[in-house]
């Protein structure tokens, strides 16, 4: 009823405004910066675990073959999806040694999109919101 009362020009402008507003949201959820055709596994120490929306983050301190360390930012899904997979805000604590598998960044920097994690006592966690194995 409301749409039929609108002038065609107003309706077109409103539709265009909605379409333009949707582009940033789609870009925000893009995973184009990750190479989903590859996986990299690193062992490191949890520096920080951020349980936040819209994405949680793990920051791992990882040593290379020469003993040089780098901080690996690893992007996960949001808390809602992680909860359904058995995660909690206390799953990871600073100082915990873990093995993480990620889809690496395409640009070659350290970091990536979370695929799976092996905790110190052997339990493996995956994130279904990034199509990770369970």
Regions found by a protein language model. Give the residues of each.
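N-terminal secretory signal peptides that target proteins for export/translocation
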Residues: 1-8
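Short aromatic-glycine-enriched beta-strand elements
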Residues: 52-63
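Conserved hydrophobic positions within beta-strands
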Residues: 44-46
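Short boundary/loop segments of OB/S1/cold-shock single-stranded nucleic-acid-binding domains
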Residues: 26-40
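Short, structured beta-strand/loop micro-motifs enriched in basic residues and often containing a Trp
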Residues: 76-84
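OB-fold/S1-family single-stranded nucleic acid-binding modules
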Residues: 105-129
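Bacterial N-terminal signal peptides
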Residues: 13-22
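Short nucleic-acid-contacting surface segments enriched for D/E, G, S/T with interspersed K/R
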Residues: 84-99
């Amino acid at each position: 009823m409301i749409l039929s009362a609108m002038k065609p020009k107003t309706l077109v402008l409103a539709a265009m405004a909605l379409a333009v507003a949707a582009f940033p949201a789609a870009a925000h959820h893009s995973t184009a910066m990750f190479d989903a055709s590859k996986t990299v596994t690193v062992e490191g120490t949890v520096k920080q675990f951020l349980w936040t929306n819209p994405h949680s983050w793990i920051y791992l301190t990882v040593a290379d073959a020469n003993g040089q360390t780098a901080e690996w930012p690893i992007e996960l899904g949001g808390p809602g999806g992680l909860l359904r997979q058995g995660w909690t805000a206390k799953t990871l604590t600073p100082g915990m040694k873990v093995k993480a598998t990620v889809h690496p960044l395409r640009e070659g920097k350290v970091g990536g999109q979370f695929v799976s994690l092996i905790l110190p006592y052997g339990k493996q966690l995956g994130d279904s919101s990034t199509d990770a194995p369970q």
